[in-house]
Amino acid sequence: MEGVDLLGFLIITLNCNVTMVGKLWFVLTMLLRMLVIVLAGRPVYQDEQERFVCNTLQPGCANVCYDVFSPVSHLRFWLIQGVCVLLPSAVFSVYVLHRGATLAALGPRRCPDPREPASGQRRCPRPFGERGGLQVPDFSAGYIIHLLLRTLLEAAFGALHYFLFGFLAPKKFPCTRPPCTGVVDCYVSRPTEKSLLMLFLWAVSALSFLLGLADLVCSLRRRMRRRPGPPTSPSIRKQSGASGHAEGRRTDEEGGREEEGAPAPPGARAGGEGAGSPRRTSRVSGHTKIPDEDESEVTSSASEKLGRQPRGRPHREAAQDPRGSGSEEQPSAAPSRLAAPPSCSSLQPPDPPASSSGAPHLRARKSEWV
């Protein structure tokens, strides 16, 4: 017990287990009820029977009428009511002090953990707060039980007070009980003062009952807030951790797949090729496309060669041209907006113009071959 003695620890324990409404009720009961009964009620009711006068000389009639008027002395009834209402609170306080002293003697280490009670060990009250390094035990269950008993006792004594005395003290009380002959009128001393005192104690009893209900509601709400959640076993924690890792791994894999399957931007797909570039390379065929100027030069050179050779040879060369066949067989993977140039096999060389100077030359070479 660091810095707090046994008496201080017991006071702190009792203070932490009693609500503010309960403390107000205790002050109300001790000051407005017990002190008023002892200091104001005793002088008013000490000579009550002596001053209870009846208009008859019949022996025993006054005693019988007084017994009917007041079966129980008002002063004694109020004292019994106050003691009975205070009894549950006194029992609860003694229980808290006893348990607090026992826990302080055992020490904080010898008390087992309430969340994991071991077999064969005495279970200690669950701690809910710390004051000066000490764990204050929780006695909220006992406090709620004592509130229920106190409220029931308050209601029972209030009903009994109404059936015995009513709300006001009458000035004249008629009596017809034997041995009285006929109707006998009896007179009460200080009826106004007694009526005021009875009304005051009625108000104190009603206020005590309402405070008991409010204290019960506050105690139930505080206990619900302090109630801990169900303890999680190590196996459940491991399963939850494994499932969390699996979900994280699955999320990472899905993110990687999305990154791999994401389409490239149009600028990266073009690879630096402009729309007006003279040379564009096809990704599938691997051949270099020839611009329009180069195609015209090739066409003119091919026509000149065909003009120098016999007419039957160009057809064989055109049929054996590997470039034309390769371009027709291999599919092109370029975009549709890029138009493929005409192949060389589709070029038909024009017929050479017949000239007068070329005919004698051909006849001379033919004569040499023969």
UniProtKB/Swiss-Prot annotation:
InterPro entries: Connexin (IPR000500), Connexin_CCC (IPR019570), Connexin_CS (IPR017990), Connexin_N (IPR013092), Connexin_N_sf (IPR038359). Changing residue 271 to R: In a colorectal cancer sample; somatic mutation. The chain crosses the membrane at residues 20-40, 77-97, 147-167, 197-217. Residues 41-76, 168-196 are extracellular. Residues 331-346 have a biased composition (Low complexity). It comes from the Eukaryota. One of its GO terms (molecular function) is gap junction channel activity. GO terms for cellular component: connexin complex. It is a multi-pass membrane protein. Gene3D superfamilies: Gap junction channel protein cysteine-rich domain. Expressed in pancreas, kidney, skeletal muscle, liver, placenta, and heart. Residues 1-19, 98-146, 218-370 are cytoplasmic. It is found in: Cell membrane; Cell junction, Gap junction. The keyword Cell membrane applies. Residues 246-260 have a biased composition (Basic and acidic residues). Its main location: membrane. A connexon is composed of a hexamer of connexins. One gap junction consists of a cluster of closely packed pairs of transmembrane channels, the connexons, through which materials of low MW diffuse from one cell to a neighboring cell. This is Gap junction delta-4 protein. It comes from Homo sapiens. The lineage of its organism: Eukaryota, Metazoa, Chordata, Craniata, Vertebrata.
